[in-house]
């Protein structure tokens, strides 16, 4: 049985920490694959979609989303996160106006980010199925079974109130 610690130890995932306000403590966990970190660095270095919808930059949008997630703030279902397809061991999407982040919940309040892309690119090229299948394939390759993947598809299954 693979554990989060095993995945971190073998470099399959890394923990993402974001600086929170002085009065905030992390109440959720956020991990990602090295490939996601590479994409995130591109965004943090100023990468932008062809047309931005949000008032904040994509980097600011991601920072705000990650801070909200890690600090335990309530996330708005369908606006800030949603299940890509209602199925066992579902793939989930974290959302901002300009960015989509795909991954899965390894446990309640513990998200693993695998793919990131611009909202318009995903919608224009209908990339949802490809990301969903890519995440399922990755979990198989890493020998991740149902003990490291939340089965539920409702917000209460993956996030504490």
Which residue stretches match the model-derived regions?
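Active-site donor-binding loop signature of nucleotide-sugar glycosyltransferases
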Residues: 116
């Amino acid at each position: 049985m693979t554990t989060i610690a095993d995945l971190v130890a073998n470099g399959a995932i890394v923990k993402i920490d974001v600086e929170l306000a002085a009065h905030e403590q992390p109440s959720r966990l956020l991990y990602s694959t090295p490939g996601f970190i590479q994409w995130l660095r591109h965004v943090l270095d100023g990468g932008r979609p062809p047309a931005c919808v949000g008032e904040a930059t994509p980097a600011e949008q991601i920072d705000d989303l990650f801070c909200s997630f890690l600090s335990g703030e309530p996330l708005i279902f369908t606006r800030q996160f949603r299940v890509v397809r209602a199925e066992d061991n579902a793939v989930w999407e974290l959302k901002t106006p300009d960015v989509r982040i795909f991954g899965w919940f390894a446990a309640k309040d513990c998200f693993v980010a695998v793919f990131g892309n611009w909202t318009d690119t995903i919608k224009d090229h209908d990339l949802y199925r490809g990301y969903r299948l890519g995440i399922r394939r990755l979990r198989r390759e890493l020998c991740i079974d149902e003990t490291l993947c939340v089965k539920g598809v409702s917000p209460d299954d993956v996030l504490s109130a």
